[in-house]
Amino acid sequence: MNNYQITAWCSGFIRNQVQEGDLCIDATMGNGNDTLLLSSLCGSTGKVLAFDIQEQALNATRERLDTANAPDNYTLLLESHANMAQYAEPDSVNCIVFNFGYLPGGNHALATRGETSVQALSQALVLLKKGGMISLCIDSGGDSGFEERDQILAWLKQLDSHKYLVIKSEYYNRPNHPPIPVLVIKLS
């Protein structure tokens, strides 16, 4: 990793986590970068569910997957990540990826919100199998970013440490509230 982007940092952990045949979720589809990564890692025997509420994100992701000749192992859902539990069984998902904030190049008014993000994270814990991982990139920019960041971090802090390992990192010397990477591992 030489570009020092939080998403690249998180993708290293995702690459170590996801195996051929896994079920994975991209909870915030965006422009499809994580969907493509998950699709390539879980291969033709795996499955990726990708969520976004914007048609623009779904179209951009479909184009990215088609251009990359991604395996036909994904379902793109024009749906809130707060409804992900309707699409997978409990204890069945190995990796769930969240990039909070707004769609790059999109309408900044259409950003993730603390309330629905915490709902989605609650569902993610139920869907995650033992040993599974959630990768979060928390961007505090935008109109609701600080509020969402604070809600998510407060929610993560109260998780039972016997059931979940929560690892939070941060840029220590960067100004302007850079994104915060967090990993959650389901222990039991």
Question: Can you describe what each PLM-predicted range is?
Answer:
Residues 1-22, 36, 40, 58-91:
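S-adenosyl-L-methionine
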Residues 19, 42-43, 128-130:
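Helix-to-beta-strand junctions that scaffold the AdoMet/dcAdoMet cofactor pocket
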Residues 47-52:
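Conserved SAM-binding motif I beta-strand of class I
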